[in-house]
């Protein structure tokens, strides 16, 4: 995936785990939970989160995850809730990109903030998650 250049995405509050490809959702969750336990020089690498993957129940979850798979993921991991924000880089001009509140899924008090980025390439709609 290409890097996205936008002031909101290029600050220290939002980051992506590089090379996570189909598992961007999973690594966004792991980064939200464990990035403070990982050396800052390596928290963008999937390998930094390998030992934490076993803390999440991903049984019967297929990757790349689709919207309909988020509820089963939360049923497998009832201590988590997810607040989804939407970022659609095509609908809005490059100078006026906005992030919209979408919804909170789950009933837990531990809410993970996820940025859902929708983009288009070769007439296909593609999605990527950021933590």
Language model: regions and residue ranges:
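Catalytic-core signature of thiol
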Residues: 38-72, 78-82
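Active-site nucleophile-adjacent alpha helix/oxyanion-hole segment immediately C-terminal to the catalytic cysteine
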Residues: 2-56
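Deubiquitinase catalytic domains
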Residues: 13-16, 67-131
């Amino acid at each position: 995936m290409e890097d996205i250049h936008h002031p909101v995405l290029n600050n220290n509050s939002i980051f992506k785990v590089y090379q996570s490809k189909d598992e961007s959702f999973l690594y966004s969750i792991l980064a939200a939970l464990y990035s403070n336990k990982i050396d800052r020089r390596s928290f963008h690498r999937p390998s930094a989160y390998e030992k934490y993957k076993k803390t999440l129940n991903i049984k019967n979850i297929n990757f790349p995850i689709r919207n309909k798979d988020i509820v089963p993921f939360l049923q497998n991991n009832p201590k988590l809730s997810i607040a989804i924000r939407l970022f659609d880089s095509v609908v809005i001009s490059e100078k006026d990109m906005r992030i919209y509140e979408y919804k909170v899924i789950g009933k837990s008090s531990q809410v993970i903030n996820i940025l859902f980025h929708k983009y288009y390439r070769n007439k296909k709609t593609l999605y990527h998650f950021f933590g």
